[in-house]
Amino acid sequence: RGVCSTPEGSCVHNGCICQNAPCCHPSGCNWANVCPGYLWDKN
């Protein structure tokens, strides 16, 4: 919930807002509030 997995995992390309959690990032996980390009992980 609120955690985006790495590109190797499951990522949905459509922009995501992650707070206090590693976000999906083209080059891996990144701690940020807004991570454009990916959605929250369904888990």
From Swiss-Prot:
Q: PTM 4-hydroxyproline: at which residues?
A: 36
Secreted as a keyword of this entry, yes or no, is yes
Q: Name one GO molecular function term.
A: ion channel regulator activity
Return the protein name: Mu-conotoxin-like Cal 12.2c
Q: Which domain of life is it from?
A: Eukaryota
Q: Which cysteines are joined by disulfide bonds?
A: 4-16, 11-24, 18-29, 23-35
GO cellular component terms given for this protein: extracellular region
Question: Is Disulfide bond one of the keywords UniProt gives this record?
Answer: yes
* Described purpose of this protein according to its UniProt entry: Mu-conotoxins block voltage-gated sodium channels. This toxin reversibly blocks voltage-gated sodium channel in cephalopods, with no alteration in the voltage dependence of sodium conductance or on the kinetics of inactivation.
| Domain remarks in the Swiss-Prot or TrEMBL record | The cysteine framework is XII (C-C-C-C-CC-C-C).
Residues with the 6'-bromotryptophan modification: 31, 40
Which residues are propeptide? 1
Source species taxonomy: Eukaryota, Metazoa, Spiralia, Lophotrochozoa, Mollusca
